[in-house]
Structure formats: structure tokens, C-alpha cells
A protein has these predicted regions:
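Short, acidic, metal-binding catalytic loop of nucleotide-sugar glycosyltransferases
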Residues: 24-33
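Short aromatic/hydrophobic "clamp" motif used to bind/position activated sugar donors
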Residues: 84
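A conserved acidic beta->alpha catalytic loop
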Residues: 40-49
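Conserved donor NDP-sugar-binding/catalytic core segment of glycosyltransferases
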Residues: 95-127
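N-proximal low-complexity "stem/linker" segments adjacent to membrane-targeting elements
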Residues: 1-25
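A short, conserved alpha-helix in the catalytic core of glycosyltransferases
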Residues: 150-151, 157-162, 168-195, 201
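A recurrent flexible, glycine/aromatic-enriched loop bordering the glycosyltransferase active site
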Residues: 134-156, 171
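Glycine-rich, basic loop-to-helix element that forms the pyrophosphate-binding segment
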Residues: 62-79
């Protein structure tokens, strides 16, 4: 794939070890770091020194933690491409993940697409797993869904619905609001079995909760953020039920066909499929 076709961007806030693992996995699989823009949201550890040592396409150092929405917008605008991949920094990538992700979107006329995921501890051979899983499930798609761990977004989407809400206090709710706009505009989205990531899981948010003296079960953002969706309690409840039923149906179908699904969690050295 022509590298000028895409750009990759992610935000980080401390947790340099996870950022390093992410970058190392990209280098290991031959990904071009000159297509990557990293936004640092006021880290106080060694993150900035590490980023300075890399041949990145761009790096933006914010004076404070401006949140994901602001950072994602900064990255998408700093390095504009036909496809912008927005992702977390606590992920490990797999062979051909970019080509498979964007290729699937183009073949199926999707404007937003996410890869399949395994979340939890990295206590297995992810590379071997991902190669096998991508081969098995390369033609499988969950239409009408996506996740914020990784999104490939076509440039037309920015023109149709705009960018992420640049409000720092949303603290992780930016993706929910963006997904609502995708649905309202009837933009075609999907999740593909052709591309896989390992996601350690909410590393930055967990660290921010500790900074604020919050328990892991506590929400990080403002408790009434849901009001921004302008939906009644009943509307939100019905949508959640429908989503859960659809996810269950996808999982059952994939397990029957492949013995695995597009979303798994590692628990006690085993895969839990969902």
C-alpha cells in the first residue's frame, strides 16, 4: 500500500513503556514511522525524550492533558491523508494490520473501520495468533459497529460530521459522541477479522483515576456526560439492549464458524470470546 494513503496518530499521557511497546511492534512489522504523528498530553515521565528519539512524521507536545478529542484532532489535522488511523498507545500491532484494515474498508465501501481485538495481559504469542486469525477471518465483517481502541477514518467523514469534540473534561466520552454522529449521518462502519491488535486495556485512564483518587470502578468523566447525547433514559436503554443482542449474535455465529470471535479477552491464560 502506498504510505501516502494513510496517517496514524495516537495520544499519550505518561506510560512510556506502553508507548515504546506499541512503536516497537510497528517497527518490527515494517510500518513507516514517518506516517505517524504522536501527541503528548503533558507527560511528566520519559515519554517526550523517547518521542524525540524517533523518526516520526510529527510530534506535538501539549502543555497539559487536553484530552483525547483535542489530541486526536491535532494529529488528524497535522498530517492529513485519505485515511487517518486513530488509535490508543497501549496496543501491539500485527503483520499487515494497516493494509488489511484499509483494504477491507475499501472493498466493502466502509468509511470507518476497526480491527479485531484481544484485550488483557500479553501472555500468549500474539504474532502467531494474529497471523492465523487474520487468515481464518479475513472475509468476516461486523457491519455497523466500531470501537475507539483503533479507528481508520476516511477523509470524507471529517467533511460530513466534523472532528471529535475538543472538550478536555469529556475524559473519554469523545468517542461516544463521535459514534453518535456517525450513526445519525448513516455513515457505513464495520469491524474486520482481517486485522488484529492486542490491547492492554485502558492503561492511561486507569493511571488518571489513580491521580484523582478514584477507584477503578469509578467513571473518569463527568457523571452527566450522557446528557450531551440528548437521548432519554429509555432510548439509551433500548439501544444498549439492541447492541448487546447484536454482539451476542455475532459472537455465536463466529464461534460456530471459526471457533473464535472478533473480540476476545485474556483471563487465566485463556481466551474468553465475546
Amino acid at each position: 500500500m502506498n504510505p501516502s494513503k494513510y496517517a496514524v496518530t495516537f495520544a499519550c499521557y505518561n506510560q512510556v513503556d506502553y508507548t515504546r511497546q506499541c512503536i516497537d511492534s510497528m517497527l518490527h512489522h515494517g510500518d513507516d514511522l514517518s506516517r505517524v504523528v504522536v501527541i503528548d498530553n503533558g507527560s511528566t515521565d520519559e515519554t517526550r525524550d523517547y518521542l524525540q528519539s524517533l523518526n516520526l512524521g510529527g510530534r506535538i507536545f501539549n502543555n497539559s492533558n487536553l484530552g483525547c478529542g483535542v489530541a486526536w484532532n491535532q494529529g488528524a489535522l497535522a498530517f492529513q491523508a485519505e485515511w487517518t488511523i486513530i488509535m490508543n498507545n497501549d496496543v501491539i500491532v500485527s503483520p499487515g494490520w494497516i493494509e488489511n484494515l484499509i483494504g477491507t474498508a475499501e472493498r466493502n465501501n466502509l468509511k470507518v473501520i476497526s480491527p479485531s481485538l484481544i484485550e488483557g495481559p500479553l501472555d500468549y504469542d500474539f504474532k502467531s495468533f494474529a497471523v492465523d486469525a487474520s487468515r481464518k477471518m479475513k472475509d468476516s465483517i461486523r457491519l455497523g459497529t466500531q470501537h475507539a481502541v483503533c479507528l481508520a477514518i476516511h477523509e470524507s467523514v471529517w467533511m460530513d460530521i466534523g472532528y471529535f469534540q475538543p472538550i478536555p473534561k469529556l475524559l473519554g466520552y469523545e468517542d461516544t459522541m463521535f459514534f453518535q454522529e456517525l450513526a445519525k449521518a448513516r455513515i457505513t462502519t464495520g469491524m474486520t477479522g482481517a486485522s488484529w491488535l492486542h490491547h492492554y486495556g485502558s492503561i492511561t485512564q486507569s493511571a488518571m483515576k489513580k491521580e484523582r483518587g478514584l477507584a477503578e470502578k469509578d467513571g473518569l468523566g463527568y457523571r452527566y456526560n450522557y446528557r450531551l447525547l440528548q437521548q432519554s433514559w429509555l432510548e439509551r436503554k433500548i439501544k444498549k439492549i439492541k447492541r448487546k443482542r447484536l454482539e451476542s449474535s455475532w459472537c455465536k455465529s463466529e464461534l460456530l464458524q471459526f471457533g473464535m470471535s472478533m473480540y476476545g479477552h485474556r483471563l487465566n491464560n485463556e481466551f474468553i470470546w465475546q
